[in-house]
């Protein structure tokens, strides 16, 4: 199935890591990942910028290289860019698709939805690449889904760190902070979700 997605530019040499602090606004207990090998491990990859090189905590796919991460927000959010630190040995994701304000996406229906934006990713072990979003598309967000369909050749995908840069508005819309955010919700392994539904990409 064809997706209405476009690649976006990315910037090298992110010089203000402190900006990538929307993570502190996240309720990581509500973040979920589909097809993660260890249940709940995705909650530990939304680290502080200072801890981005921590290799003890990561999320790894289980049945194949695909991961779906669902991130609900507690307030209206604008996302400006995304940083991804993946694993070595070909386990870093090489593609990312984003879907906004749809909390019902899983492997059984993801091909039924057009993604909001798609990026071709590079192997980045330092967090030096920020993938910019389309400004007109990533406003008024209350839920973000990130889909990683493939990697650089490993049987499984590993992600050590995700940071979201943007603007977080308090629930009462009284305070605006430049920061990052993320949370998801869904099931664990693809075998529990599919029940025979095909999820081939085209």
Swiss-Prot record:
InterPro entries per UniProt: Galactose-bd-like_sf, PITH1-like, PITH_dom, PITH_dom_sf
Positions of the PITH domain: 11-184
Stored SUPFAM superfamilies: Galactose-binding domain-like
Intrachain disulfide bonds: none
Entry GO terms, CC: cytoplasm
Membership in a protein family: Belongs to the PITHD1 family.
The protein's name: PITH domain-containing protein 1
